[in-house]
């Protein structure tokens, strides 16, 4: 009878001890970066997406195909998972009809399998008054998107209180993808740096206002560090990510250093955008967030700093250089 060698036994024990994470929406920016970072940190990573191609988008990730609204498909993918990363996010125009249901589906499955949930949060809920937005800052529903997010966040807090579900609510500024970036519809790629190749830098607001940014490779690295910290996530843990605080001018300078040439500053065409927004729901939602470019803001990160006191963010110029070299 064949007996396992010592090395094979060690590998078998190692596989058993590996923690399992399910990334829901693995093909998106946030999902891809989390999947790669957790795989590299030794986690057993499962990727859940609507198509086989998307579920297989990251090497070394076990693919699961299905719809987030299908409890059987999502439940099968989550079975035995220690952590679920909720990285699925519909377009703005579908938030009203889909966002709450999608996140409730994740909550229900997480309660059933006993998994910790990591859910990314944004800054929309802080309203139009700038400054330092701390974790305990009041939530203000100043627009429709903010009110939907507030309802969604309340559902996670309710699950933590009523069911003891561990939640890592990770709040960040606007996303900036890593060197392996793929086409997406965010501010940085679709507007600000869309024409970098031709020397244009299109900024949505005044060039002297602080703006919160989240470099996703750093975000994923921080999430791994938190999840690998014993007893870090108990109940509902609301954390603000430090990220980068950049003005338009400092971002432009960093990009100029990265690409090795001066950039011509252009302004966003807000006037025609406002007109088109009268009958375009997607653009109407974009226009409703214009204030974030006029109001200087940053995230207060006291809780994060206590939890990960030695965390160091990637330098923006280094990140931009890596991005445009690839």
Regions found by a protein language model. Give the residues of each.
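Conserved Rossmann-fold NAD(P)-dependent oxidoreductase catalytic core, especially the SDR/UDP-sugar
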Residues: 104-151, 168
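NAD(P)-dependent short-chain dehydrogenase/reductase
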Residues: 174-210
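Mid/C-terminal beta-alpha module of Rossmann-like enzyme folds, strongest
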Residues: 6-20, 222-286, 301, 306, ...
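Short-chain dehydrogenase/reductase
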Residues: 96-100, 131, 142-154, 181-189, ...
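Conserved beta-loop-beta element that borders a ligand/cofactor-binding pocket
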Residues: 122, 154-180
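NAD(P)H-binding glycine-rich loop region in Rossmannoid oxidoreductase-like domains
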Residues: 53-113
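Conserved beta-strand positions in the Rossmann-like core of class I SAM-dependent methyltransferases
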Residues: 46
């Amino acid at each position: 009878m064949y007996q396992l060698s010592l090395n094979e036994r060690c590998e078998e024990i190692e596989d058993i001890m590996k923690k399992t994470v399910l990334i829901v929406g693995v093909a998106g920016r946030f999902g891809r970066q989390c999947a790669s970072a957790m795989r590299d940190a030794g986690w057993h990573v499962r990727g859940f997406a609507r198509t086989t191609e998307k579920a297989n988008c990251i090497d070394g990730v076990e693919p699961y195909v299905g719809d987030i609204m299908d409890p059987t498909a999502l439940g099968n993918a989550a079975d035995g998972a220690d952590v679920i990363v909720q990285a699925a996010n519909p377009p703005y125009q579908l938030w009203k009809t889909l966002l709450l249901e999608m996140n409730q589906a994740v909550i229900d499955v997480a309660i059933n399998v006993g998994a910790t949930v990591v859910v990314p949060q944004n800054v929309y809920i802080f309203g139009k008054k700038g400054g330092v937005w701390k974790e305990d800052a009041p939530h203000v529903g100043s627009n429709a998107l903010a009110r939907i997010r507030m309802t969604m966040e309340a559902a996670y807090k309710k699950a933590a209180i009523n069911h003891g579900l561990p939640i890592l609510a990770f709040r960040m500024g606007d996303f900036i993808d890593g060197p392996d970036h793929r086409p997406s519809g965010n501010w940085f790629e679709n507007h600000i740096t869309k024409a970098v190749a031709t020397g244009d830098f299109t900024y949505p607001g005044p060039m002297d206002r602080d703006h919160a940014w989240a470099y996703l490779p750093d975000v994923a690295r921080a999430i791994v560090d938190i999840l690998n910290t014993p007893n870090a996530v108990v109940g509902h843990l609301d954390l603000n990510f430090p990220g980068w605080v950049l003005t338009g001018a400092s971002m432009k300078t960093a990009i100029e250093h990265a690409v090795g040439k001066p950039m011509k500053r252009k302004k966003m065409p807000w006037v025609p955008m406002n007109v088109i927004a009268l009958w375009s729901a997607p653009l109407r939602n974009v226009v409703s967030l214009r204030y974030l470019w006029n109001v200087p803001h940053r995230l207060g990160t006291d809780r994060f700093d206590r939890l990960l006191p030695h965390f160091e963010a990637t330098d923006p110029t280094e990140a931009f250089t890596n991005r445009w070299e690839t």
